[in-house]
């Protein structure tokens, strides 16, 4: 996350897309544990302090969803039973899913 914040999401995603350019297909498994629980919630198994901000996750997933080689994007580790903020993690994840569906062509 430090490198992402230093270089910026756009620069990091350019690097990632370059590394993925030789792949035939891209399968993304987005673990919501990667998002900062102070900005989202603890509605996941292993919250990561100082993780991704929701807007960073949104930008990352938008780039991946637009990539013609992306065949699947899954979202894992949402656990409403652990959410102290009334399903906030599920709602944030739903927003990310909506972004992906709007961008995926």
Language-model region placement:
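Catalytic cores of soluble, metal-dependent hydrolases
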Residues: 1-105
């Amino acid at each position: 996350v430090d490198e992402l914040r230093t270089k910026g999401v756009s620069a990091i995603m350019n690097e990632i897309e370059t590394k993925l350019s030789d792949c035939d297909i891209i399968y993304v498994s987005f673990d919501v544990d990667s998002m900062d629980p102070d900005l989202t919630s603890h509605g996941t198994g292993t919250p990561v302090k100082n993780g991704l901000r929701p807007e960073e996750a949104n930008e990352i997933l938008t780039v991946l969803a637009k990539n013609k080689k992306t065949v699947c994007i899954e979202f894992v580790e949402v656990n409403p039973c652990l959410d102290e903020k009334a399903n906030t993690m599920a709602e944030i994840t739903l927003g990310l899913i909506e972004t992906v569906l709007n961008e995926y062509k």
